[in-house]
Amino acid sequence: MKRNISKVAVLGSGIMGSGIACHFANIGVEVLLLDICPSELNESEKQKNLSLDSKAVKNRIVNEMFNKCIKSKPSPIYSKNFIKRIKLGNFDDDISKIKSADWIIEVVVEKLEIKQKVFDLIEKHRTPGTIVTSNTSGIPIKLMSKGRSDDFNKNFAITHFFNPPRYLNLFEVIPSPNCDKHLLSFLLKYGEKYLGKTSILAKDTPAFIGNRIGTFGIQSLFHQVKNGDYTIEEIDKLTGSIIGRPKSATFRTADVVGLDTLISVSKGIYDSCKNDESIEIFKEPDFLKKMVKNNALGSKTGKGFYKKIKDNLSLIHI
């Protein structure tokens, strides 16, 4: 089956969803970016006498998330002119529009039950044969594919982008148990030729390849701080550009990834790999759990290990 990708639907407009939408727009693809509708009005909407049925309210989440992404640095998009390639909408009003998409990418929160609800919507509205992929950073595809139709699973895989999607080179592809071999080949080649990535075929193992290694490295250093061996400043000075790695080093990288995402991936590994010789490394330290509880999730909430004040980053002492 010859495939041509002229329109992509991205379901979920968070930091990854909006970033992926921008990167497809960068290469000339039309994008439909959707997210959920709010469950209640904010103060501004109340003052304007809007209702939950108002279009502005229904699109509030996707608008806010996308605008935040566009303003982020480094820019997720090559040119502001490319923004017009991205259409915004919500699941209630616009989900039927995925029928015309050549590729549907799920990028919602890392909870299996929520992803399954999104897959139900996709099954209802997609055109048979359409590619469906998940950007999960660690949920096994064998679990996500349960209960899905034969056509869905034949065209289903994980395509794991790394944050930020425009800049990070790795692109992991994990096929569903019944994935069509031609689709798998297509995704790997598309990642290389059009998305500008290094495509890697990974097995359906906990956290795949990149996050299994990366999470181990980050968590190892978290425990160094917990044990009082090093400070955050010392670790970031020693694990950044001085050794040829990005200047975000360890703790700033964790902020970019999202501390809640980091905990989710770590927990998935901890629960699934009991025989791993270093399993205790994946058990998050108490200070990390406390930060997430206080909504200090990193870049997505404006504070994590670092807090942005105007154009400068200041370290928050934990």
Regions found by a protein language model. Name each.
Residues 1-316:
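N-terminal glycine-rich phosphate-binding loop for ADP-containing cofactors
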